[in-house]
UniProtKB/Swiss-Prot annotation:
GO function terms (MF aspect): guanine phosphoribosyltransferase activity; hypoxanthine phosphoribosyltransferase activity
Pathway note: Purine metabolism; IMP biosynthesis via salvage pathway; IMP from hypoxanthine: step 1/1
Catalysed conversion reaction: IMP + diphosphate = hypoxanthine + 5-phospho-alpha-D-ribose 1-diphosphate; GMP + diphosphate = guanine + 5-phospho-alpha-D-ribose 1-diphosphate
Gene: hpt
Role summary: Catalyzes a salvage reaction resulting in the formation of IMP that is energically less costly than de novo synthesis.
Protein name: Hypoxanthine/guanine phosphoribosyltransferase
Localisation per UniProt entry: Cytoplasm
One Pfam family here: Pribosyltran
Record organism: Methanococcoides burtonii (strain DSM 6242 / NBRC 107633 / OCM 468 / ACE-M)
Assembly, per entry: Homodimer.
EC number: 2.4.2.8
Enzyme class: transferase
Keywords: Cytoplasm, Glycosyltransferase, Purine salvage, Transferase
PROSITE patterns: PUR_PYR_PR_TRANSFER
Length: 190
Protein backbone atom coordinates (compact mmCIF):
# COMPACT_ATOMS: atom_id res chain seq x y z
CA UNK A 1 0.00 0.00 0.00
CA UNK A 2 1.31 3.43 -1.01
CA UNK A 3 4.52 1.80 -2.23
CA UNK A 4 5.55 4.70 -4.48
CA UNK A 5 5.14 7.17 -1.61
CA UNK A 6 7.03 4.95 0.83
CA UNK A 7 9.94 4.42 -1.54
CA UNK A 8 10.17 8.14 -2.33
CA UNK A 9 10.27 8.96 1.40
CA UNK A 10 13.03 6.45 2.04
CA UNK A 11 15.13 8.17 -0.65
CA UNK A 12 14.47 11.72 0.63
CA UNK A 13 17.60 13.77 1.37
CA UNK A 14 17.91 15.37 4.82
CA UNK A 15 19.13 18.92 5.49
CA UNK A 16 19.38 20.89 8.72
CA UNK A 17 17.22 24.00 9.21
CA UNK A 18 18.46 25.54 12.43
CA UNK A 19 18.53 22.48 14.68
CA UNK A 20 15.69 20.78 12.83
CA UNK A 21 16.38 17.83 10.49
CA UNK A 22 14.23 18.55 7.44
CA UNK A 23 13.41 16.07 4.68
CA UNK A 24 13.31 17.24 1.06
CA UNK A 25 10.50 15.50 -0.80
CA UNK A 26 8.46 16.06 -3.97
CA UNK A 27 5.16 16.24 -2.03
CA UNK A 28 6.40 18.77 0.53
CA UNK A 29 8.88 20.71 -1.59
CA UNK A 30 8.21 19.99 -5.26
CA UNK A 31 11.78 18.81 -5.71
CA UNK A 32 13.63 16.94 -6.97
CA UNK A 33 10.70 16.01 -9.25
CA UNK A 34 7.00 15.46 -8.60
CA UNK A 35 6.19 12.37 -10.65
CA UNK A 36 2.68 11.59 -11.94
CA UNK A 37 2.78 8.06 -10.49
CA UNK A 38 3.26 9.49 -7.01
CA UNK A 39 0.43 12.01 -7.37
CA UNK A 40 -1.86 9.37 -8.86
CA UNK A 41 -1.22 6.91 -6.01
CA UNK A 42 -1.81 9.59 -3.37
CA UNK A 43 -4.97 10.93 -5.03
CA UNK A 44 -6.47 7.46 -5.39
CA UNK A 45 -5.84 6.76 -1.71
CA UNK A 46 -7.33 10.12 -0.69
CA UNK A 47 -10.44 9.36 -2.75
CA UNK A 48 -10.69 5.95 -1.04
CA UNK A 49 -10.73 7.77 2.31
CA UNK A 50 -12.94 10.75 1.45
CA UNK A 51 -15.20 9.47 -1.30
CA UNK A 52 -16.83 12.21 -3.38
CA UNK A 53 -19.61 13.50 -1.12
CA UNK A 54 -18.45 17.11 -0.80
CA UNK A 55 -18.82 20.33 -2.77
CA UNK A 56 -15.27 21.63 -2.87
CA UNK A 57 -11.64 20.71 -2.24
CA UNK A 58 -9.68 23.18 -0.10
CA UNK A 59 -5.91 23.21 0.15
CA UNK A 60 -3.09 25.52 1.12
CA UNK A 61 -0.49 27.17 -1.09
CA UNK A 62 2.06 26.06 -2.19
CA UNK A 63 2.37 22.29 -2.08
CA UNK A 64 -1.31 21.68 -1.50
CA UNK A 65 -1.92 22.93 -5.04
CA UNK A 66 -0.77 19.78 -6.90
CA UNK A 67 -2.76 17.59 -4.50
CA UNK A 68 -5.94 19.63 -4.90
CA UNK A 69 -5.48 19.79 -8.67
CA UNK A 70 -5.20 16.05 -9.21
CA UNK A 71 -8.11 15.41 -6.81
CA UNK A 72 -10.22 17.99 -8.63
CA UNK A 73 -9.47 16.36 -11.98
CA UNK A 74 -10.25 12.86 -10.69
CA UNK A 75 -13.45 13.80 -8.81
CA UNK A 76 -14.81 16.65 -10.94
CA UNK A 77 -15.01 18.83 -7.82
CA UNK A 78 -13.86 22.47 -7.82
CA UNK A 79 -10.97 23.54 -5.64
CA UNK A 80 -10.09 26.62 -3.62
CA UNK A 81 -6.53 27.42 -2.65
CA UNK A 82 -5.83 29.23 0.61
CA UNK A 83 -3.21 31.78 -0.39
CA UNK A 84 -0.29 33.42 1.36
CA UNK A 85 -1.04 36.84 -0.12
CA UNK A 86 -4.01 39.14 0.07
CA UNK A 87 -6.27 39.84 -2.90
CA UNK A 88 -8.75 42.13 -1.18
CA UNK A 89 -11.80 40.42 -2.64
CA UNK A 90 -15.18 40.79 -0.99
CA UNK A 91 -15.58 38.13 1.70
CA UNK A 92 -11.86 37.36 1.91
CA UNK A 93 -10.99 35.91 5.32
CA UNK A 94 -7.58 36.58 6.84
CA UNK A 95 -6.04 34.26 9.42
CA UNK A 96 -2.69 34.04 11.18
CA UNK A 97 -0.80 30.78 11.23
CA UNK A 98 2.33 29.59 12.94
CA UNK A 99 4.13 26.41 11.92
CA UNK A 100 7.24 24.74 13.27
CA UNK A 101 9.44 26.99 11.16
CA UNK A 102 7.42 30.00 9.96
CA UNK A 103 4.67 32.48 10.81
CA UNK A 104 2.42 34.41 8.48
CA UNK A 105 -1.05 35.20 7.28
CA UNK A 106 -3.29 33.12 5.06
CA UNK A 107 -6.17 34.38 2.92
CA UNK A 108 -9.31 32.39 2.16
CA UNK A 109 -11.47 33.18 -0.87
CA UNK A 110 -14.12 31.35 -2.87
CA UNK A 111 -15.83 29.33 -0.14
CA UNK A 112 -19.54 29.78 0.43
CA UNK A 113 -21.58 29.33 3.57
CA UNK A 114 -23.13 25.87 3.66
CA UNK A 115 -20.57 24.24 1.36
CA UNK A 116 -19.17 20.88 2.39
CA UNK A 117 -15.40 20.87 1.96
CA UNK A 118 -12.62 18.32 1.85
CA UNK A 119 -9.38 19.79 3.22
CA UNK A 120 -6.10 18.34 1.93
CA UNK A 121 -2.50 19.27 2.66
CA UNK A 122 0.99 17.93 2.12
CA UNK A 123 2.50 17.72 5.63
CA UNK A 124 1.40 18.15 9.22
CA UNK A 125 4.14 18.66 11.82
CA UNK A 126 3.03 21.01 14.58
CA UNK A 127 -0.51 21.43 13.27
CA UNK A 128 -0.16 25.22 13.10
CA UNK A 129 -1.64 25.65 9.64
CA UNK A 130 -4.68 23.45 10.22
CA UNK A 131 -5.14 24.89 13.72
CA UNK A 132 -5.74 28.26 12.06
CA UNK A 133 -7.54 27.06 8.93
CA UNK A 134 -10.18 24.61 10.19
CA UNK A 135 -11.90 26.93 12.71
CA UNK A 136 -11.79 29.73 10.12
CA UNK A 137 -13.58 27.54 7.58
CA UNK A 138 -16.23 26.66 10.16
CA UNK A 139 -16.64 30.33 11.08
CA UNK A 140 -17.27 31.01 7.38
CA UNK A 141 -20.11 28.48 7.50
CA UNK A 142 -18.33 25.67 5.67
CA UNK A 143 -18.91 22.08 6.73
CA UNK A 144 -15.65 20.11 6.91
CA UNK A 145 -16.34 16.54 5.84
CA UNK A 146 -12.77 15.30 6.04
CA UNK A 147 -9.17 16.41 6.50
CA UNK A 148 -6.49 14.37 4.76
CA UNK A 149 -2.76 15.04 4.96
CA UNK A 150 -0.20 13.02 3.03
CA UNK A 151 2.67 13.05 5.55
CA UNK A 152 2.49 13.30 9.34
CA UNK A 153 5.59 14.19 11.28
CA UNK A 154 5.47 15.15 14.94
CA UNK A 155 2.39 15.60 17.10
CA UNK A 156 0.30 17.92 14.93
CA UNK A 157 -2.36 15.32 14.09
CA UNK A 158 -2.75 14.51 17.81
CA UNK A 159 -3.07 18.22 18.62
CA UNK A 160 -5.81 18.53 16.02
CA UNK A 161 -7.59 15.54 17.54
CA UNK A 162 -7.47 17.30 20.92
CA UNK A 163 -9.25 20.23 19.22
CA UNK A 164 -11.96 17.88 17.92
CA UNK A 165 -10.67 17.45 14.36
CA UNK A 166 -9.81 14.04 12.94
CA UNK A 167 -6.88 14.31 10.52
CA UNK A 168 -6.42 11.29 8.28
CA UNK A 169 -2.80 10.82 7.27
CA UNK A 170 -1.41 8.55 4.59
CA UNK A 171 1.97 8.04 6.26
CA UNK A 172 3.47 8.92 9.62
CA UNK A 173 7.21 9.43 9.64
CA UNK A 174 10.13 10.31 11.84
CA UNK A 175 13.16 12.16 10.51
CA UNK A 176 16.71 12.23 11.79
CA UNK A 177 20.10 12.71 10.17
CA UNK A 178 20.06 9.07 9.03
CA UNK A 179 16.92 9.61 6.95
CA UNK A 180 13.18 9.12 7.01
CA UNK A 181 11.67 6.27 9.05
CA UNK A 182 8.14 5.22 8.14
CA UNK A 183 6.18 4.57 11.33
CA UNK A 184 2.65 4.09 9.94
CA UNK A 185 1.04 3.62 6.54
CA UNK A 186 -2.69 4.36 6.32
CA UNK A 187 -2.97 4.01 10.10
CA UNK A 188 -1.12 0.68 10.31
CA UNK A 189 2.15 0.54 12.23
CA UNK A 190 5.17 -0.61 10.27
Amino acid sequence: MLEVLQESLRKAPIVIRGEYPYFIHPISDGIPSLEPELLDEIADHMIDIAGKDYDRIVSIEAMGIPLATVLSMKTGKPMSIVRKRQYGLEGEVILSQSTGYSKGELYINGISKGETVLVVDDVISTGGTLKALLPALENMGANICNVIVVISRGDGAAKMSDMGYNVNTLVKIDVDMDGVSILEVAGEQQ
